[in-house]
Amino acid sequence: EMPFTEDDFDPQLEQALELMPELLGDERAEIRYAINGLLSLTPDGYPILGETPEVKGLWSAAAVWIKEGPGTARAVAEWMTHGNPEIDLGHSDIARFHPHQKTRAHVKARTSESFIKTYGIVHPGEQYESNRNIRLAPMHASERELGAVFYETAGWERPFWYESNAGLVEKFGDACMPRENEWDSRWWSPIINAEHLQMRETAGLVDLSAFVVFDVIGPQALAAVQNIIVAQADVKIGRVVYTPVLDETGGFRSDLTVMRLAHDHFRVVTGGAHGMADKKWFSDRMPDGAVVVDLTSSW
């Protein structure tokens, strides 16, 4: 907490008086307590909550603003004592970050950009401009030549549509569901829907380089995987299983793909945005005789 400076607060107080003149203009209204606090910002704008992946039993409740303090404290306490909070905190899970998202350079770049947008009107699809191109797929250059429009997911540049497929919009017409509202049409293109329709008619290749990949290996690998996923894990070697992952209360945590590579060897492929949290979920539930090996950066 820093000393309160009225000069910094006066412009905001004048704006508040315009919005609530009857309340703040009342002669009985007064400032009981005033602080000049620092804003805690994170690379993606969400708090940093939960047990750290690096140290068992070390919990974080960081980047929590005053107005969210009581609710956050309750949720984290539930998480610590019961294993799951009453509300979903997946977007704020400290385990969500990839190693390249925790570097000092990345954190500084993103939080500096976030500060400017903190009280702005930010479109849900709006992309960060800072520190881009830190993770590129092997076919990135070819995708760019095809007119790919890249969005970032967990540091990876992923094509959301290809301008070279613009002709498909005319082919499918209204089936592309064009968006007439200007706000809805920001950070979007009807080419997205046209590409989906074309793939349903023919075939296509989807770049999944940004997905998280980790193996579960050991004599207890089958028991470990079966304890975590909903689908049957005891399948023939070479089979691929698409399955939900539930928590202890039956709540939905994730959907992912599991491949059985050997009797005691399973490979898990899951989304890039939540994949590191999925890896921690598996790691926390490994019995003696099974280990998790992260292969995300091995390709």
Residue ranges of predicted features:
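Short, well-ordered beta-strand elements
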Residues: 1, 59-62, 266-271
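Well-ordered, non-transmembrane segments within structured domains
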Residues: 1-52, 196-246
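C-terminal catalytic lobe of FAD-dependent flavoproteins
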Residues: 3-135
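Glycine/proline-enriched, intrinsically flexible loops and inter-domain linkers
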Residues: 98-299
